[in-house]
Amino acid sequence: MKKHLFLLLFLPSVLFGQNNLKYAETIKVEDLEKHLIILASDSMEGRETGKKGQKMAADYIMNHFKNIGIPPYKKKSYYQKFKVKNGRHMCKCDDCDTDFLKKMLGKNKYIKGENVLGFIEGTDLKEELIIITAHYDHLGKHEDKIFNGADDDGSGTVATLEIAEAFMLAKKEGNGPRRSVLIMPVSGEEKGLLGSKYYTDHPIYPLENTVANLNIDMIGRVDDWHENGDYVYLIGADMLSQELHDISEQINNQHIGLELDYTFNAEDDPNRYYYRSDHYNFAKNNIPVIFYFNGVHEDYHKVTDTVEKIDFNKIQTITRLVFLTAWELANRDERIQLNKTD
């Protein structure tokens, strides 16, 4: 009898653990491609923060959240609107045409943008929060040139849309996350990480309740250092929580099998990627982060960063890795621990 009772108690956790793969497999190439064809189209005018195209992209993301059943946060709005002083342009490589970027991005003293909130309330641990981010803004247009930003960061944005849909399907089927999950495409990244900075200054949950941030920025191309797309650069996972790094490794080894490349995973990396995307605003608030990144390529910050060059199988694989990692963080009994400091 005791043995049978143990098995009955153990069975729900086993089934809950098996569900992660079921929902991960709903993240598919055709859906990622469908979203990116729209978000990286000329009609979005390059999605520059504060401009018409960015507002159109925000509406597209909001409508996706609405259509899959995510309600407005606190029944009020899907948007966290901000008006902040223009920052400095962000560039993930050292050979960008900075004079050109300043002309494009430095015209307005104040910037109005929106972060889009896809909030999925948890169950017994709902007061703790996992945040998944990607920036949906890009460089906009200049004269007759449109910077579509298919990889930067259309690729990460469509990943968040599919992660949101997978979590919502789980919730509808009675397998929703124990911790709350916030899928938050942000704007203002190209102008100085403005949207994520605004969020960490005005969080919807206390920052001390935020367990981790998983940030996705450029996952749709292959850089010059790799022969194929079976890799992803991970940055930051062990800097604040070795436990987060270990979980990430375990999930990948068990379910995905990518090469996890830590080439740029150092605070003193000369490329300074740790400081160049939205995860940094969480990390500097002592929130563990992972930054998922494919590296820069010849079309980075150019009008040639277009949809037809995207490797959607690569996006699918990395998106499933992010989802499975978030699933584990949201459903484990104990929240991950910060590294001990002397």
Region annotations inferred by a language model:
Residues M1-N20:
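Bacterial Sec-dependent N-terminal signal peptides
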